[in-house]
């Protein structure tokens, strides 16, 4: 779909045969990239991320080919269909298009080096786009000109489908010319005339849009949960759970799931069942999983089934952990580590945290690593017991055999070994009082009550004690419904309204937000370093062809305004800003400077030819309008199919595609309006500096 949209866009505005050869370079680029994915080179596989890399590259890699193809065709049409003119047309735009590709390579290569598990995952599509871009340089600078060298520019009028398409192209070209002369040029002249006001207006727009995430108009979730294709219940029991409790809990969970399905079907006015498969798996005696898949025609959603199933289930006996989820979480959700030297402080803080979380909508499956202690009975031989000949070893063996049992016989039944164990009847070994009332045998065979030979102490012992940096520690965790509240919003809320009071009340308590918050801090730190490196690389690559340190900064103003476009795209599509969005924004940083580089390079060439300042700016913008619009539109339409995709796999890709697609559209307006204004402001400042320098020289001279 994306390839078709790109080709149609090219064919609308380029000569049909030029558009064909530009699009024909895509197979070379993609097959070449597949070759470098083999074991001998990058050792990568075709998966969701690498496929997304190809889709993202689809609109980007034709950008320089569009510029080269248009330049070659225009040069040959003006000066003749010769090989020399083909070379001249290629050479005219070779440097800006080459360095434009290299700036994009710099950002995608930086993206492939983001650290962390998720960074490693997303680095795959960064590597794919980098390979595609490098191969596009070979295709656009060597292969494409070779094809265009044999393309006649002077042809007779066509009939049939070709003639009809020529009329369509004529309409498209007329529309572009109307836009250029009736809308763009008048607006451009107003912008350069009132350039300082225009820059202030753009800055105001930047401030307003960047405030959207801060005000909550655009929600932020660094690691958003994605819709899954099943509902899963994961059950874990305490180690001292009674025999058969796991099986009983799984049976109850299964019944609740079926009841939730019946209720939802009735509420929707449907018939039958929405469940296509239900699989129950018991892992030993202390854990199990139930996985439910829904029929394609079910009248309710996975989230609705998950919520109703949770509501019907409530608290189960002996359960340590129960999570019923319909969404795939990229990392652990909410988690906070509590540490203190005082055990009572930890227990109180643990209770307070759980109570606060229970009152927050969208927070569920709250768990704590503070497990109930195990009841313990300790026996101490009395002086009378020692006098009667009882010792610790004899007492422990008798109690173990009485309550745990002793194997007295083994035999085979159907090739299976059967153990015969002798112990007290079940009704006599279920309660602590049964131990208190037991009888023990002395060495001479006399049977006496346990209380005669031993004192019994009852206590509670923790199953495990966790220490971090010498302090007792525990963890409170929870799952978060990001449609209601994200983990980022939850942490911010707790830091503002709860944590300060808790730390004031328990001064020996320290806490640390782990889980998603910890992963976010780690990934953000890596992305900041990578982003700075990418910006420095872009600056260096722009400074080389422009031979200036100021003009690269002017061009790079398109980057923050590209981010504005990305945020507007998220806002208009109801998307949350996330790590996936930031990956798209990082990639956007290299793409948005390409059109500005073309424009500034053309401006510099016109100035060297002696054209007046404002005339050079206007001529550079109008002459590059077609190429700028075409490269931006092809990038957007190449990504557009992802933006409309509803499949579960695409949910990981849409935020990055929205960042790049909408960012490049908005950056186009920046290229065509803000960059000319900034060029003239720079010339204004340079002129003031030159005049001031002359005045100083006259005074000192």
Residue ranges and their predicted role:
Residues 39, 47, 58-72, 94-113, ...:
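Transmembrane alpha-helices and their membrane-interface boundaries in multi-pass membrane transporters
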Residues 245-329, 386-405:
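Solvent-exposed, membrane-proximal periplasmic/extracellular interface segments of envelope transport
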Residues 93, 162-221, 622, 700-701:
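Signature of alpha-helical transmembrane segments and their immediate interfacial
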Residues 220-291, 343-376:
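Extracytoplasmic/periplasmic
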Residues 4, 8-12, 16-73, 540-623, ...:
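Hydrophobic transmembrane alpha-helices and their membrane-interface caps
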């Amino acid at each position: 779909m994306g390839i078709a949209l790109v080709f149609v866009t090219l064919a609308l505005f380029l000569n049909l045969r030029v558009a064909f050869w530009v699009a024909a370079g895509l197979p070379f680029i993609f097959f070449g990239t597949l070759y470098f994915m083999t074991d001998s080179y990058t050792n990568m596989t075709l998966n969701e991320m690498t496929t997304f890399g190809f889709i993202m590259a689809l609109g980007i890699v034709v950008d320089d080919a569009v510029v080269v193809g248009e330049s070659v065709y225009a040069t040959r049409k003006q000066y003749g269909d010769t090989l020399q003119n083909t070379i001249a047309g290629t050479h005219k735009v070779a440097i800006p298009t080459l360095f434009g590709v290299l700036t994009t390579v710099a950002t995608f290569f930086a993206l492939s080096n983001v650290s962390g598990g998720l960074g490693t995952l997303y680095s795959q599509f960064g590597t794919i786009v980098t390979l595609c871009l490098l191969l596009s340089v070979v295709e656009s600078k060597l292969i494409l000109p070779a094809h265009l060298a044999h393309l006649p520019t002077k042809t007779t009028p066509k009939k049939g489908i070709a003639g009809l398409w020529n009329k369509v192209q004529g309409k498209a070209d007329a529309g572009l010319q109307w836009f250029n002369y009736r809308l763009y040029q008048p607006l451009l002249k107003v912008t350069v005339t009132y350039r300082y006001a225009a820059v202030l207006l753009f800055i105001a727009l930047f401030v307003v849009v960047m405030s959207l995430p801060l005000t909550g108009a655009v929600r932020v979730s660094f690691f958003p949960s994605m819709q899954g294709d099943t509902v899963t219940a994961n059950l874990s029991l305490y180690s001292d759970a009674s025999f058969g409790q796991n099986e009983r809990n799984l049976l109850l969970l299964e019944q609740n799931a079926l009841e939730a399905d019946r209720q939802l079907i009735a509420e929707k006015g449907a018939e039958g069942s929405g469940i296509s498969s239900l699989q129950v798996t018991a892992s030993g005696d202390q854990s199990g999983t139930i996985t439910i898949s829904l029929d394609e025609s079910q009248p309710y959603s996975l989230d609705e089934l998950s919520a109703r199933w949770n509501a019907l289930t409530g608290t189960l006996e002996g359960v340590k952990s129960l999570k019923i989820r319909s969404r795939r979480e990229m990392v652990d959700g909410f988690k906070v580590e509590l540490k203190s030297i005082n055990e009572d402080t930890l227990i109180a803080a643990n209770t307070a945290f759980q109570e606060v979380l229970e009152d927050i909508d969208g927070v569920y499956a709250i768990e704590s690593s503070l497990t109930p202690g195990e009841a313990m009975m300790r026996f101490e031989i009395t002086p009378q017991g020692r006098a009667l000949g009882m010792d610790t070893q004899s007492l422990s063996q008798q109690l173990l055999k009485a309550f745990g049992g002793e194997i007295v016989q083994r035999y085979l039944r159907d090739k299976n070994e059967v153990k015969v164990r002798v112990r007290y009847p079940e009704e006599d070994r279920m309660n602590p009082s049964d131990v208190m009332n037991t009888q023990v045998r002395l060495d001479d065979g006399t049977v006496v009550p346990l209380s005669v030979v031993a004192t019994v102490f009852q206590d509670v012992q923790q199953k495990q004690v966790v220490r971090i940096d010498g302090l007792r520690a525990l963890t409170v965790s929870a799952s978060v419904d990001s449609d209601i509240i994200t983990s980022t919003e939850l942490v911010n809320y707790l830091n503002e309204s709860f944590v300060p009071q808790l730390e004031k009340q328990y001064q020996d308590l320290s806490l640390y937000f782990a889980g998603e918050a910890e992963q976010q801090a780690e990934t953000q730190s890596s992305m900041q370093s990578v982003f700075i490196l990418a910006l420095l690389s872009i600056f260096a690559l722009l400074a080389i062809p422009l031979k200036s340190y100021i003009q690269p900064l002017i061009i790079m103003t398109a980057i923050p305004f590209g981010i504005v476009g990305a945020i507007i795209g998220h806002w208009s599509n109801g998307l949350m800003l996330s790590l996936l969005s930031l990956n798209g924004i990082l990639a956007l940083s290299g793409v948005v400077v390409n059109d500005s580089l073309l424009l500034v390079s053309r401006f510099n060439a016109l100035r060297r030819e002696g054209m007046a300042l404002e005339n050079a700016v206007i001529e550079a913008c109008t002459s590059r309008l077609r190429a700028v619009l075409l490269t931006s539109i092809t990038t957007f339409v190449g990504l557009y199919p992802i933006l409309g995709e509803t499949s579960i796999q695409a949910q990981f890709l849409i935020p990055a595609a929205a960042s790049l697609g909408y960012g490049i559209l908005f950056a186009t307006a920046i290229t065509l309006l803000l960059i000319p204004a900034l060029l003239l402001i720079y010339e204004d400042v340079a002129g003031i500096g030159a005049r001031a320098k002359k005045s100083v020289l006259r005074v000192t001279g």
